[in-house]
Amino acid sequence: MIRLDLERESTTPLFEQIASAFRERIMSGLLHEGTALPTERDLAKRLGVNRSTVVRAYGELKADGFVEARVGRGTVVAAVEGEGGGIPRGVEPLEWDSLFSPDAGSCGDLFSEMMSVNGREGVISFASGFPDPDLFPAEVFSGLERDLSAADRRAQFLPSPVEGFGPLRESVSELLSDRGIDASSRDVMILSGSQQGLDFAARTFLSPGDIVLTEKSTFFGALEIFRTSGVRVVGIPMDRDGMRTDLLESAIRRHNPRLIYTLPTFQNPTGITMSLERRHELLGAASRFGVPVLEDDPYGELRYGGSPVPPLKALDPCGCVIYLSSFSKVLFLGFRVGFVAAPAPVIERFSRLKQMTDLHVNTPAQILLDRFLRGGHYAPHLDRVRAAYRRKRDRLSEALSRYRSRIGWDWDLPDGGYYLWCSLPGFFPMRAFTAKSSENRVAFLPGPAFCADGTPRQNRIRLNFTHVPETDIEEGARRLARAAEKARENGSGETAFADGQEPIV
């Protein structure tokens, strides 16, 4: 039944009130195309008005194209144009594309594409940044859930503090101590994944027109957040020891940045680990010029060889480092729990943003993760994950090596992390390669997606080895090589993508 409330003391005529009420319901979609309106006699009786008042109201709606008379059905909501459900003929729908912020429009959609590619039948994807779902300790978490106390079971249905579930903050503080970072639970905040920390840092420190310094090639998710904020990103060249800190100080003098963003350990996409000497030099420059450092460390515990290097936060002499990390890369992607360790004023400001954004992280996930850490399950799980990923890394490297002389690709074997950063000959026909890879049902991420300053490195591709099933790695490498050979046979020698094109193939 359609309910209409009339204001009989209003100066607006009753027929206009009736017409307006129906018009609002049709425009909002509450009344859909083909919905029958009450008969004139029934509506007049229900509203206590003359039938002529309803006749006049329906006449207004018909004249405006909102309703029409149909034989055998009476007055119904008019047919609509397109798929605009509730928008009658003659009424123009909003032109949404013209209303979007230009900054939001510049944001890429690589993550959605990655999810789509991974779901395509028969595709072997090296494009993702995902962990291996088969390594999730499902039985452990099921047992932890069964063994929750009555108090914990009740707490799952309650909100947690904005800064995070107190016991979990304490557990994270202990975990940070194992990484050499001195941070009390008050210095820790739980996040909905570490990428939320990137967003909060941008909203806290940056304004349109500001400058961020980062590695020349870096995490595309961070680049999208910075660029959507109207910020200019300046890339610092890298070598095998990480960011070229000999160029950093001059860049700080020249650009007066508001933030330095870095992934110093098993960097995404290069897999490079910044040397200890470079870390001290970076911190020294940041301290001298008063520039905060945002350290992103999602892969630091995934070491398969080499000697450990302390996080920047563990070496920080002046408290200028904001440290981000996550459990998503070592557990599973759907477990969107990350954390930040930072000085109290930063935690306070992030907490305000968290309260405005999503109040707090999912309470059941926080409780279960805390029990997982306190129960001593984290270290053995890490050992299992490291062993599996080391094996996958080596298998991919060996598979690619079989085609090295034929294709001319090359890479450095990283000591940890998720990725091989593979170079191709400078003359390589990259556009043809992307097309042939798609035809051969194999996926990767191309170098331009990671370019900080918009200067594409067209002869690079990033290959993820953690998510692809180990049994598919050999075949995936064969498909890549086949696509590369076909590209050289049929390619035009072009090395540049079209403007703005950053395909996943």
Q: For each of these PLM feature ranges, what is it?
A:
Residues 188, 291, 321, 409, ...:
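Short, conserved active-site loop motifs that form the nucleotide-linked donor/cofactor pocket
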Residues 1-146, 351, 355-362, 370-373, ...:
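N-terminal basic, amphipathic alpha-helical segments
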Residues 327, 448-452:
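Short, solvent-exposed loop/turn elements at beta->coil junctions and helix N-caps
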Residues 214, 235, 293-295, 369, ...:
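Hydrophobic residues in well-ordered beta-strands that form the structural core
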Residues 145-289, 300-318, 389, 471, ...:
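Conserved core of the PLP fold type I
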Residues 301, 308, 314-349, 364:
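Active-site PLP attachment segment
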Residues 49, 66, 231, 257, ...:
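Short glycine/serine/threonine/alanine-rich loop segments
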